[in-house]
Amino acid sequence: MEALKNLSLTTGTSIMEILFPTIKILAPHLQKNRNAILSVPRSTHTYGSHPRQTLDLYPSSTASSTSPILIFFYGGGLTRGDKILEVPILDKLVYHNLGSFFSKQGITTIIPDYRRVDSETGGEGAIYPSGGEDVSAVLHWLSKTDLLDGKGNKREVYLMGNSAGGLHIATYLLEPRFLEERKSWQGEANVSLKGAVEVGVPFSFEEALAGRNDMLEKYYGSDKDILARCPYGLLKAVGESKKSREELGIPRLLVMNSEYDPVDEILNPNDAFVKLGEKIWEEKIEVVKIEGHNHISPPMALSTGEGEEWGEKAAAWIKINS
């Protein structure tokens, strides 16, 4: 989208600086496609005991009982975000637009709310590793529900995390405390965890803006804890274990980042994470550059008819690996 390119030229790539201008650019495109977006129904379900642990389910437009399942964790800097954003100009279309998009690609889509770090905007007192626990709770709910398929067929599941949502997926995939559970999804369970897509994820925080310090301390702990518990730190510990990706129950990864993502907070940490992962596992990690997008725009562009190529690539990757 030319408007996003122009925004990067005039405003730069800083996430907070581009947030509302990006919403203003994309809102009219979403509203224009409102009927098509809402043509895919969503139902809301509870996946845990905390009031925040609810999820929206968007059934595949094809065969829901056999389709792959995508679980999407949205971004929001660990302190914000909802499965339906309450931003008036967006008219409750985000993230229904994402659920609708992947549904029409033949992929049943689940979008959970998760616990957030306390801030001036609210929060549920989230403290590490609550994000990984919420990922775990969604997978357990999925393994037990008969909403999608009462016949007990094995379902192939993919995780997708955008920005802070990707931190929670990385916690689940790399934290030793979830090891046995991850391995169970590779075995005889009716849920098979096949892959994870990380979109614009800050895999480490050495170059994070100073304004994030309070949030990082509340969630991760001390400076030492932040280094150890961020995805890069967890991956480093994985390397020291000398175990293969398969032995650790870690599925295939697809790493995506945007052309106009900030270099300091996103692109540099992405490069370092991918290089370390490839060194540890001695295999290539697929990386996709999302052309023409900034940090905020990829999920919001889906179902607008423009800038959807990244979603098509993610859907194709899911289908190839299924």
Predicted segments — roles?
Residues 61-101:
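Short, surface-exposed "cap/lid" segments of acyl-processing enzymes
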Residues 88-94, 98-101, 105-155:
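Catalytic nucleophile-loop/oxyanion-hole region of alpha/beta-hydrolase
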Residues 249, 254-258:
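Short beta-strand/loop motif that positions the catalytic acidic residue
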Residues 137-211:
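Primarily recognizes the serine-hydrolase "nucleophile elbow" in alpha/beta-hydrolase
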Residues 72-75, 111, 255:
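Structural cue for short, hydrophobic secondary-structure segments
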Residues 29-37, 201-244:
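Mobile cap/lid helix-loop segments that gate and shape the active-site cleft of serine hydrolases
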Residues 256, 263-274, 278-322:
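C-terminal catalytic histidine-bearing segment of alpha/beta-hydrolase fold enzymes
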Residues 7-65:
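N-terminal cap/lid segment of alpha/beta-hydrolase-fold proteins
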